[in-house]
């Protein structure tokens, strides 16, 4: 429901976005998933099942989960995916011991991961639309290039999307691609 509302708004505003999808949700909502691709949005993989303990148990478990999501996206949405986003971001408390190996193996296969440098902070808790917009403004920090994290499953995010877009007239909103230099958290294993 929220994703369809977001897609309606993006279509009305002629804006393309990037959706990092969860394979489990693609299987549960195939028509909405197909619509994302059919309307020209960039599709990336988030995961298949959003379970940090399972995902980050090992590099193999992460890649197995990714492959299942990838196969689902290819089968249902009809797109080949090259972008992915780590659940919790590339640097989090769950993946410290496996992140480096995951990144190396995924990059060897030609995948690119994106993190974010601004956020609605909508992943946890029930927030009102105005709070989400304030979070976006506070975390954008007048950067020239912003990758804003938002979650389509959150009702307030869908409800405030038009106002959120209007709050940033100075930005050209466009989807992530393989040609854009990715925003990535500092690779803690690199100096």
Language-model segments: what does each one mean?
Residues 19-24, 45-47, 85-88, 117-118, ...:
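A cross-domain feature marking catalytic cores of carbohydrate-active enzymes
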Residues 80-82, 145-146:
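Residue-level recognition of the N-termini of beta-strands and the immediately preceding loop/turn
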Residues 42, 112, 172-174:
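Conserved beta-strand segments of alpha/beta enzyme cores
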Residues 5, 51-77, 90-144, 159-160:
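Alpha-helical scaffold elements lining the catalytic groove of polysaccharide deacetylases
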Residues 33-36, 58-61, 129-132, 187-191:
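Short low-complexity, flexible loop/linker segments enriched in glycine and/or proline
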Residues 1, 26-30, 123-126, 155-158:
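Loop/helix-junction capping segments adjacent to catalytic residues or to phosphate/diphosphate-binding pockets
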Residues 1-80, 163, 167, 180-181:
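Active-site beta->alpha N-cap acidic-glycine motif
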């Amino acid at each position: 429901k929220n994703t369809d509302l977001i897609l309606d708004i993006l279509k009305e505003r002629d804006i393309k976005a990037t959706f990092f999808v969860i394979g489990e949700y693609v299987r549960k909502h195939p028509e909405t998933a197909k619509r994302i691709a059919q309307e020209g949005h960039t599709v990336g993989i988030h995961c298949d099942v959003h379970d940090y303990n399972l995902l980050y148990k090992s590099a193999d478990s992460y890649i197995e989960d990714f492959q299942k999501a990838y196969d689902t996206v290819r089968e249902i949405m009809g797109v080949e995916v090259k972008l992915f986003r780590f659940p919790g971001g590339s640097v989090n408390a769950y993946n410290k011991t496996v992140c480096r190996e995951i990144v190396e193996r995924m990059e060897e296969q030609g995948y690119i991961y994106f993190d974010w440098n601004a956020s609605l902070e909508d992943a946890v808790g029930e927030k009102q639309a105005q709070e989400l917009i304030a979070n976006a403004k506070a975390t954008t920090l007048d950067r020239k290039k912003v990758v804003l994290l938002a979650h389509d499953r959150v009702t307030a995010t869908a409800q405030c999307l038009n106002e959120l877009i209007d709050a940033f007239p100075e930005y050209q909103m466009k989807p992530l691609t393989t040609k854009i230099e990715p925003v990535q958290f500092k690779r803690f294993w690199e100096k």
